């Protein structure tokens, strides 16, 4: 199978993912998953979720580049990108990924600040007298 490309997004983070058939190597920003995320086990599981769900953790290689956002948002963007790449790799995986919500882009982003307010919704202190 040829290389499959997909992008995943979450908040301001973007993950560009290339998926090829191989032996289960993950290369994220030139590092392995353990080097990239260190001791964040819950976030590592989040990244591996689509691979474990489709039982492809030992049969595909993933090369990814992440931009913007923090570690958690980048990891969720990576999960979204891997899910989209697996869907393009084999359409049969869609039935496993779609019910878990892994192909859906999480559209929640930071609410903008409004004028006359201190933050998006926080008002200045009100004094009656």
Curated annotation (Swiss-Prot):
PROSITE patterns: RIBOSOMAL_S9. GO terms for biological process: translation. The keyword Cell membrane does not apply. It comes from the Bacteria. The keyword Transmembrane helix does not apply. Pfam families: Ribosomal_S9. PANTHER family: RIBOSOMAL PROTEIN S9 (PTHR21569), SMALL RIBOSOMAL SUBUNIT PROTEIN US9M (PTHR21569:SF1). Belongs to the universal ribosomal protein uS9 family. It comes from Helicobacter hepaticus (strain ATCC 51449 / 3B1). This is Small ribosomal subunit protein uS9.
């Amino acid at each position: 199978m040829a290389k499959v490309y997909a992008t995943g997004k979450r908040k301001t983070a973007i993950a560009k993912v290339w998926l090829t058939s191989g032996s289960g190597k993950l290369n994220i920003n030139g590092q392995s998953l353990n080097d990239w995320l260190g001791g964040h086990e819950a976030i590592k599981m989040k990244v591996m979720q689509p691979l474990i769900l489709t039982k492809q953790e030992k049969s595909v290689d993933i090369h990814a580049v992440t931009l913007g956002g923090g570690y958690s948002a980048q990891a969720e963007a990576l999960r979204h990108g891997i899910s989209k790449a697996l869907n393009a790799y084999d359409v049969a995986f869609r039935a496993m990924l779609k019910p878990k919500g892994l192909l859906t882009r999480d559209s929640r982003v930071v609410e903008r600040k409004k004028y006359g307010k201190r933050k998006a919704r926080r008002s200045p202190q009100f004094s009656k007298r």
